[in-house]
């Protein structure tokens, strides 16, 4: 059966743009006739070899229903005849399934990529080619599969119907059915049937293809689809400008199109796509681009504008000039070549393309000239360059070096020896040979001359007053020269005629001299030690997983998070200031150079006419013709615009400017101004930025002190240790000199230390068999104390038969666990008990050795063991291996030998190990008095403002002192050691109950005071509470209760209280001055020097010290000093291989512990009020933390505009104030006002004059 195309009822009607119906077949399969089949039946199709049949249905009887399209031989208008009928499928073969088949390449990712079918919508107009153009484009292109063409009838304007053949893969129409010869060997399932895969698979992609290597923009080209779409967009844009008769826009679009084609060429070279199909297609693409570029220029130059306008406006293509038709035909071929290139690359649709546009490497953007220490942690500290870590790894991989982790990637300076003797980070020999071929040997940053200031300076500048003084001193030296330069500029402005050129050169020379003098300031800014802020960021990370030995609770995490948010904007401003410092210096140099030029605009032609980012790719949302001006016109108009200059124009320059305009001269929008004004303004900016640098260094120093001050006042020594970890000079302690201590406070007085020199001299006179064997392995300090020694030497000195060093013995027994395990320590003592006699002794010498050394040493061993078990034993010292020592048997042997104290030793051993009594000799007492009723009396609480104000400040301070001193007395030396050692030496220490309770009480008191104030809605009552607590703190000071006093001060300077402007206004100045004096006493400057002086003057008075200072001293002494000493021989200049115990570190710990114990001995003679004490204890429970209190503070006084500072000289005010004290808008505007005038090439725009 047959029918005309217009009456084909089995097709789905589709209308074109002009409303004409286009019958479109929807076959379920396409088959090719392989054998001839003739039939006379009208419901069956006769087939010839090569016919394409479009299958509509597949019958169950073995016959298929299909459509065969042929030209009508009897009709002059070449109408189409559609034959539909049944045909036998055995005479055909399906080609649709082969087209969509997926080759088995053994890789799941490649299978997914090969089966991906993205439909490109590259052009709004269809691409229609003649057979000649199609064959010309596809000549020498090997298609591994035959292309499937769908015949599509299309109505023409004259009412005729034209048949076009459409290929969906190439998205192209052809006027004649193309036929391309197929290869003889079928390679559908062969790996090489996909040229892109065959060339790339198995090879390493270029290093620029790594998705984690660069900071990418949203508009960057990443995939093949994006690239093809972007290029086609510029083709469409160029074609539209051609038809619009806009020559300037056409040239701009053509320039952008040429840049994108260049990117395509570079991309194919980077991917090493050397397949002939790619090379030939790309060559044809470039040739076609050159062809229509030449023809288009001929079109614009040879044809008048009006004629071009008339020709381009013709809707009938036949009425256009042949040249224009040829150009448009070339555009059609260009579109098809792009589709063909995309079709050949289609199997790699998800492959990430190499980065072609310049982008910053990740972890490397440190502004222009400055290092960013917040990114340096990712770099190897031993590297001689600051190359990005990802870049180093990528280049190493491209050089044949495989590193499983970043630590295996070495980097050494050019020409530096890599032998194992000089560096323990040297690579292996095979790696050295490979590395010679990498790019690192030619990296400029790897040379000694181009190293940064950071790499040249070994130690950073600490954040302290000394560093600030260096900056200020350098600035004062620069100010004198700068003022003279400003004076010269003013003289030029007042007397331009007599201003010589020589003076210009002199000012230029002084500018360079001034800038060179700025290097020390740049050195300080570049090398400030920001370790504490780096640690704060790490600790404030919510995703951070802490080690087991790091104890950080929820309250500590809340404090860290709050501190990080409060300090982040200060650090951001600091780095902005560094960048503006760079901008001002650069501008200062440029302006000074202008002074020596006859024509200050002589370098203007060197400026690029194109704006920044002119050739940047466009965003996907902009790739349509409606938004085409975003790239072509918008970028040129908006990006080139610069702000007006704020300098006053020179009158003579204005006259010249207007004359040039009147003469129609090209002035290129240049601004004529007086250079002296510019130079003077640059000097002013330079002067201001120097002051600004001092201000920011001072702010960083204050914020560091405030952060440590708050952590110390809250007794968060673990936080302090983590914040200062890695900081230069952290915890340093000069072991050579012992801190001066009051004789009254010295608990363990050693009256014999002054005679140590004479005693050591007497040892030399003894016979050799009576001398100490390990005396040469002891290191003595200048204070006649043991500074260090080997384990054998320390044990020998501990059990010495002639010398009893009481302080050494106590220090050893308290801190022995940091040197030995319990089993090891007792084993050494047992070995010392069973001393072997020296060799070659006669009978008399042996008897003398037994009498004068062996027996006294045995007595000393038994005495030391007894003292250890009786006074210094701690349940955490127990170990499973202790049973192997048979201590009870050892004691019984000592009893049989009649050793003094052996009976008591056996008693202590049995008590500690056999009877299971593992209680500590100094067991802690209960927190409260035993007579206090254990039943909680909840009726009386300080829960209201009236109840708190009703209590007399003296009574409250007295009972608070009694309560806190009782808790302080429960602190043991083992609590302190547990706090600083944690699990460092043993995991059986557990918690520190006494110390934890004392710290918890102080922090609860702080929260109670601050919460009592913020929950009160009435301003006058809040002011009374402030005054009331200040008076309580003052009485606590009079009672030497520094712990409670510090807790109250910390509460009043907390973020939720400090910001209450209206409340502080209601407090009288005398009371605020009283608070200021209390805060000055606890000033953390110089390691709490004011508080330490006050504490030292107390002598025998009762006191509750502020424990935060002790915790800091213990933490810094333990963490900041090594456990071992390494001696260096002066003659050889090499280190001794033996390790000596740093006993001086242990002595310093005991010095601090003895001061803690001292204040437990003197008690207060106050009368205890049980009701008040119980009310205080119960009121401290269930108090909200800092965040909840701050929310209440915002409710009672929202958004204060300015702050009334209760203590203007307090150093902890900026840490305690909240991050919301300054609104975000305020911060932003402040930063803009401060730094806007330092922007290079841009100044503030003057307000335009509005004419009425």
Swiss-Prot record:
Gene3D superfamilies: Ras guanine-nucleotide exchange factors catalytic domain, SH3 Domains, Son of sevenless (SoS) protein Chain: S domain 1. Promotes the exchange of Ras-bound GDP by GTP. Keywords: Cell cycle, Cell division, Guanine-nucleotide releasing factor, SH3 domain. It comes from Saccharomyces cerevisiae (strain YJM789) (Baker's yeast). Residues 26-97 form the SH3 domain. Disulfide bonds: none annotated. Residues 1214-1236 have a biased composition (Basic and acidic residues). GO terms for cellular component: plasma membrane. Residues 416-428 have a biased composition (Low complexity). Residues 1239-1252 have a biased composition (Basic residues). Suppresses the CDC25-5 mutation in yeast (restores cAMP level) and has similar functions as CDC25. Residues 409-454, 623-648, 1201-1252 are annotated as: Disordered. This is Guanine nucleotide exchange factor SDC25. GO terms for biological process: cell division; Ras protein signal transduction.
